Amino acid sequence: PLSTYAVSKVAQETLAFQYHRSYGLRTVVTRAFNHEGPRRGHVMVTSNFARQVAEAEAGLRPPVIEVGDLSSVRDWTDVRDVVKAYWLALERGTPGEVYNIGSGVGRSVREMLDLLLGLTSLDIEVRVDPARLRPSDVKLLVADCSKFHAATGWQPEIAFEQTMRDLLDYWRQRV
């Protein structure tokens, strides 16, 4: 693991498995990849960019988006789909198993930003802020959800473009 967050996730999975094996606790572990949507905290990249766009549209900031590394690839899924996946994991998942939850589609942070910029009529400059560059960042995170799909039949229903539109609209209503 490259971060303390990743270490904590591995520890949680190990504890869940041990409680399942040792005490028969019906644990089902889910590894939800990036999940996004309205009400997402502004410290997360999608929400942070959407908030900056909304603030620029409202005249609260210059038309400049401050960014970090745009080359990283992530698997973004709408949080509303992820909540359905959690429910199905409880209903249909096999105790003791681990399931990946995501779209299975990788998009760069740049692609996500371009999508948001395409939803505004403003001409917004993109500026790299060195303070936003992470010292240890995983370059590629894309889920293989075939095991979860086979167990539950789940697949995402909300298009990424709709998720980003809803997220930007959320921030437009709040700035």
Task: Map each language-model feature to its residues.
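Active-site helix of classical SDR
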Residues: 8-11
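Amphipathic terminal alpha-helices
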Residues: 160-175
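C-terminal "lid/loop" region of Rossmann-like NAD(P)-dependent oxidoreductases
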Residues: 64-69, 98-99, 107-114, 121-140, ...
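Core catalytic loop region at the nicotinamide-binding pocket of NAD(P)H-dependent oxidoreductases
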Residues: 60-65, 89-101, 124-126, 175
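Amphipathic alpha-helical segment in the mid-to-C-terminal domain
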Residues: 4, 42, 46, 79, ...
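NAD(P)-dependent short-chain dehydrogenase/reductase
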Residues: 14-75, 79-90, 104-109, 113-120
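Catalytic tyrosine of NAD(P)H-dependent dehydrogenase/reductases that use a Tyr as the general acid/base
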Residues: 2-5, 74
